[in-house]
Structures are given as structure tokens and as C-alpha cells.
Design a protein with these regions (language model features):
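Short, well-ordered loop/turn sites that connect or cap secondary structure elements
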Residues: 29-32
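Short, basic/aromatic beta-hairpin or loop at an interaction surface
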Residues: 1-20
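Short beta-strand-centered aromatic/proline hotspots
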Residues: 44-54
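Short alpha-helix capping/helix-loop boundary micro-motifs
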Residues: 19-27
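Short, solvent-exposed secondary-structure boundary/capping segments
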Residues: 54-69
Length: 72
């Protein structure tokens, strides 16, 4: 199965775009809510708040990963 390509948004489903075409760095896995991660553009750490995806369509612009900044 192909990995999902995500549009990463900050704060909400209509929040500012942090990154487009993000692919999670671990093969055969996807991020989960509550997880902390760094994006491939070098930004982070971020905490995953919400994942919205189109089942069976890994390269959809409607695959949205909502994140929030992790405070030190």
C-alpha cells in the first residue's frame, strides 16, 4: 500500500499550510494523533492533533494533517 501524502496545516483544518506533499518518514506507517514529529522541511517539533484522509486515495489534497507547535 502506498504511503499517504499530506497537506500539513497548523491549528485547524483551515489553518495556515505548514507544508504540502508531506510523506511520513517511516515506511508502511502513518502518523497518529498525539504523536510528536519533525517535518521533512526541518520544522518542528509538532504534535499531531487531527488526521483527515480519503480512504484508499493516498495522494489526495484532502489528506490533511493538523498539527500544533510543541512548547519547550
Amino acid at each position: 500500500m502506498a504511503q499517504y501524502t499530506w497537506t500539513v496545516r497548523e491549528g485547524s483544518l483551515d489553518g495556515p499550510v505548514v507544508m504540502k506533499n508531506y510523506v511520513y518518514g517511516i515506511p508502511d506507517k502513518e502518523p497518529v494523533e498525539g504523536q510528536e514529529l519533525y517535518l521533512s522541511n526541518g520544522s518542528g517539533p509538532w504534535r499531531v492533533r487531527l488526521l483527515e484522509h480519503v480512504p484508499g486515495v493516498p495522494r489526495s489534497p484532502y489528506n490533511i494533517l493538523v498539527v500544533e507547535r510543541v512548547e519547550d
